A protein has these predicted regions:
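Bacterial Sec-dependent N-terminal signal peptides
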Residues: 1-25
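N-terminal "domain-start" segment that seeds a small globular fold
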Residues: 20-51
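Short loop/turn microsegments at loop-to-beta-strand junctions
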Residues: 35, 58-59, 135-136
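Hydrophobic beta-strand positions
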Residues: 39-40, 63, 140
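Short active-site neighborhood of thiol/selenol oxidoreductases, capturing the structured segment around
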Residues: 49-72, 78
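Thiol-/selenol-based redox modules, centered on thioredoxin-like
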Residues: 134, 140-165
Length: 165
């Protein structure tokens, strides 16, 4: 079982090393609206889909890996800007195992931000819609559900807040 876990972690890491989102305007137009998705969120494996999102609220989708240093830094920054982000829905999705995602959730005390939903992107379904190659990758949607901005890499919360103005 331990060998299987190590193999799964290695495969996940290999997938994540294949970097870069194609951020050309032509390709970003595919993501103008929030796509349909379903994932299992921590801490209780509850199913969460695009139908569970609140309407008329901005949304930030952050694709991450628990072992990515840039993702860890971005997460610490989200926590530091807790008050500024309290009215923004944040969906953090990872292709890593549910156990790794749950450990990340607990380690960063993400329960302290109820507007964050963090979960396992089963079979990399949502990540493949966005054709992800880099973590973190961040997609910012305005209150109407239209894509405001897409970011690749650690960009900081001020850039996210600016995209929502």
């Amino acid at each position: 079982m331990k060998k299987l876990s190590i193999l799964a972690a290695f495969i996940t890491g290999a997938i994540m090393v294949q970097a870069q989102i194609d951020s050309s305007a032509k390709n970003l137009s595919k993501f103008e609206k929030i796509p349909s998705f379903n994932m299992y969120i921590v801490p209780d494996s509850t199913s969460f889909s695009n139908k569970n999102l609140k309407t008329n609220k901005s949304l930030v989708i952050m694709f991450f890996s628990p072992d990515c240093e840039h993702c860890q830094k971005e997460t610490r920054e989200l926590l530091a800007y807790k008050n500024e982000l309290k009215n923004i829905q944040i969906l953090m999705a990872s292709p890593s195992s549910y156990g790794m995602v749950k450990q990340f959730y607990e380690e960063y005390n993400l329960a302290s931000m109820p507007n964050i939903k963090l979960g396992n992107d089963v079979n990399y379904a949502l990540g493949s819609i966005y054709q992800l190659r880099t973590f973190p990758s961040i997609f910012v949607y305005d209150r109407t559900g239209k894509l405001a901005k897409a970011f690749v890499g650690n960009i900081g919360v001020p850039a996210i807040l600016e995209a929502l103005k």
